Amino acid sequence: ATLQAITAGGFTMTVNGTLVVISAVNLSAVTSFAQAASAIQTKLQTQKPGTLCSYDASLGKFVITSPTSGVTSTITVASADVSGLAAAIGMLSATLVQGKSEETPEDALTQCEQYDNSFYGVALDSEYDDVQASYDAAVWTQARNKVFFNTTNDADCLTATAPTTLVGQMKDASLKRTSATYGPVAGSYAGVSVAGRAFTVNFEGTNTTLTLMYKKLPAITVAKLSSSQKGHLASINCNVFLDAGGNSIYDEGKMADGTFFDTVHGTDWLQNRIETDVFNLMYRSPTKVPYTDTGVSMIIQKVERGLRQGVTNGLIAPGQTTDGTYLELGYRIDYIPVSDVSDADKGNRIYRGVTFIAVGAGAIHKITITGSFSE
């Protein structure tokens, strides 16, 4: 009834620094708050196009929104109330929310991290493909135990200028936690498709680890490239879903520094598995893990449990270490007896004596076969 009594209402305010004078607002025929908001918006549009007026039923408030965003988006409380219109819609004592600078992906990731740091994979909206924000996200990810899946549509990656591209810069920075994928179609989210395939691995299974090489990427356009173009992509460790002899395959599954993705993914899993098992050993103990050789043996059992699962899932296999030592189990665990631990560490209840070395099973990507034939 208060609104319907207004036949020639008005008020003044500023929107983005521009004075807006609203007048001759007739609400005598409205039957809802939404209709009243629509009538006010019609007047606002004539003064400041794009300015909106709506009614939020959940809050029970009228909301006026400027037509822009960012730090230049400002609005002021209404004044010069005519016929009580501003008072009726709560604009004389309204809560003001001014525009802010655009949040960068790096800022958003930091906020996510502070709220819940359990996420592992990172990918950005396609609007950030091939812009500085994607490089910043890659650097952000590198500083944490996470993986960034980057998508590029930059055709320069297919030419001799590839090293100057953002992907080339990622290679130069040796970003071991960034996987870059070239997609011929803008907005394809090729990197997201890679993440979806990569994260299907069940490390608690048997022979479940995989290489990304030769895999399919559903809904991703296949790139038809010349050998020269493929070479330029390879020179900057940029992956691609391409046509190879009539077959669609992902090539080659490397990170920006040249490390294969499955190595990074697998060792991250192994670290998390061992850390979790050792933590649970202490957390679930009704008493304690004693600082004795018996306590150290309990820790070693948990470390070996993770390594054995690494053998089971195919991450680890018997083989030679870099110094030529053959490990029949695929791993070796060493430890320091409690008697050799420093008094300072024992006094602080810190044990640093367990180390291990493991041999990765790896994967075969290319095969060279030689032979001869005589008749």
Regions found by a protein language model. Name each.
Residues 55, 76-214:
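Extracellular Cys-Trp
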Residues 114, 168-299:
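Extended basic-aromatic, gly/pro-enriched interface segments that bind polyanionic ligands
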